[in-house]
């Protein structure tokens, strides 16, 4: 009969690190994560809702993604990595006899960040192809010009809190009556070195 070897419990060796949101989101605590050392926790992705950061329940459908980029003691510092509206929310917006217009574009901010942004416009009635194309062009133009005029943090704030959606709505409703305009999804593709 062979003797049992002692098994070392690796979970007891791990330390817990606090994950903190960026300064633009008020450095709110996003959660905790276990790791042997802080460098092992780098590049981890954290998901939360805008409701968790602001306390405003009407923003519960906005999901935010952050990536761990640095260490400060036992705190892990993060950077905005993207956002997405919940699928339930988007499905509740789509109606019969109306058009859904998607516009996806890559934009570069003033400070060199590259993001992929997906805009969404919903019309009150069914629109013609030419009207959809014009609305899509307006979405692309506003997204690219606003990105080139603002820094990464300002651009993210405009997207997440709906200021950019409102500006697109005001311009695009001149082409065809719109019911709702949202920035459905963003993803950080490249950050400056």
Curated annotation (Swiss-Prot):
GO terms for cellular component: ribonucleoprotein complex; ribosome. Belongs to the eukaryotic ribosomal protein eS1 family. Keywords: Ribonucleoprotein, Ribosomal protein. PANTHER family: 40S RIBOSOMAL PROTEIN S3A. It holds the Pfam family Ribosomal_S3Ae. This is Small ribosomal subunit protein eS1. InterPro entries: Ribosomal_eS1 (IPR001593), Ribosomal_eS1_arc (IPR030838). GO terms for molecular function: structural constituent of ribosome. It comes from the Archaea. One of its GO terms (biological process) is translation.
